[in-house]
Amino acid sequence: MDSRVLESALRALSRYPLCDRCLGRLFARLGRGWSNRERGEAVKRVLVMELHRRVLEGDEAALKTLVSAAPNIGEVARDVVEHLSPGSYREGGPCAVCGGRLESVIASAVEEGYRLLRAYDIERFVVGVRLERGVAMAEEEVKLAAGAGYGESIKAEIRREVGKLLVSRGGVTVDFDSPEATLMVEFPGGGVDIQVNSLLYKARYWKLARNISQAYWPTPEGPRYFSVEQALWPVLKLTGGERLVVHAAGREDVDARMLGSGRPMIVEVKSPRRRRIPLEELEAAANAGGKGLVRFRFETAAKRAEVALYKEETARVRKVYRALVAVEGGVSEVDVEGLRRALEGAVIMQRTPSRVLHRRPDILRRRRLYSLDCSPLEGAPLMECILEAEGGLYIKELVSGDGGRTRPSFAEVLGREAVCIELDVVWVEHEAPAAPG
Ligand SMILES: [Zn+2]
């Protein structure tokens, strides 16, 4: 029986001092249920025994080999070297790969890592490792010298050992599929930091009043409007997060209400410290924050990939609006029938509205108006219209014509000025997209 394990261990130890873990790691895929430290320790003992045997059988070269490798092997070789060749044992340098830091970094990463997992209310985590370049290079050199081919990387060992020891403390588990956080271990520095995944909730909001913005809109004199985002701040407080972001499927004008179906959105809480708050509690906090002006429904947890789906979805989904429209000189039944015939099913050619030109590129969009149903109001030059339109059609401009930038328009068909004085979104099409997995 030849021993390629011993041969490659000797090749590595002839050139590099290696701690038990870093030697054992060269053979990580041999044997089961042992730590690399146990492997390294065992290989060192058997190697010393084998060299000792050869010396006892008169092999002069074996004694030279043993004496010269002893500093790299370490303490376990001391007694036999001193016995065979008194006074020739020398202390070796620190481990060529880990600098002797591996044990202590693993131990301290577990301490600090556990504290962080608890502080951020994490149950499912993964461990990542940031390796200094020098360590990776030393690891490659030693692997090359040993030529073993059954090893694993120091990164893999740190990840596994830290993960295993954290799990053994209880209350946490390694989860590669849906971790709540990643612990990053610096090696050999030993620092640990935590990347906490956001909380994501599928939800809906209703804006029951006008002049409410979707995003928080700060000015030196305080917020410009009350906002959907601001209404959600109690959720931020409840979860102990650092920041809250609303990913809504589109947005209505500040002065439009959002009624009916409500608008789908994903609420994101960044760096939360409390993750397991029941949806009903979050919803109650949000509704308290909405002060009766904004209502919320929290539906389920969401996945990160669904954020993009919600945002993409906004572009073309159907929406139903209620508009209160003032018409110069009043409106008759003949007018509303004329509007319906001219515009229902029509493709509206719309240049970017002049009111948003300062922040949006000037493009031409084509959006279909699926249906239009207007009723004149008694005793006033007003009509109430229910419109179903392709997402992205600007309704106020469809009414006014925006100086000819939107065609056709209510004003163009009627031959008189028309202005949308109230707008409500009453329904937003929503496929409830779900990310795979
Ligand atoms: Zn080492």
Curated annotation (Swiss-Prot):
Listed GO biological process terms: tRNA pseudouridine synthesis
Originating species: Aeropyrum pernix (strain ATCC 700893 / DSM 11879 / JCM 9820 / NBRC 100138 / K1)
InterPro entries associated with the record: PsdUridine_synth_cat_dom_sf, Pus10, Pus10-like, Pus10-like_C, Pus10_THUMP_arc, THUMP_dom
Occurrences of domain THUMP (ranges): 76-198
GO molecular function: tRNA binding; tRNA pseudouridine(55) synthase activity
Keywords tagged on the record: Isomerase, RNA-binding, tRNA processing
Family: Belongs to the pseudouridine synthase Pus10 family.
Taxonomic path: Archaea, Thermoproteota, Thermoprotei, Desulfurococcales, Desulfurococcaceae
Gene: pus10
Active site residues per record: D253 (nucleophile)
Catalytic activity: uridine(54) in tRNA = pseudouridine(54) in tRNA; uridine(55) in tRNA = pseudouridine(55) in tRNA
Function: Responsible for synthesis of pseudouridine from uracil-54 and uracil-55 in the psi GC loop of transfer RNAs.
Record flagged with keyword tRNA processing: yes
EC nos: 5.4.99.25
Pfam families: Pus10_C, Pus10_THUMP_arc
Binding-site positions, substrate: Y321, Y394
Alphabetical list of NCBIfam families matching this protein: pseudo_Pus10arc
Protein name: tRNA pseudouridine synthase Pus10
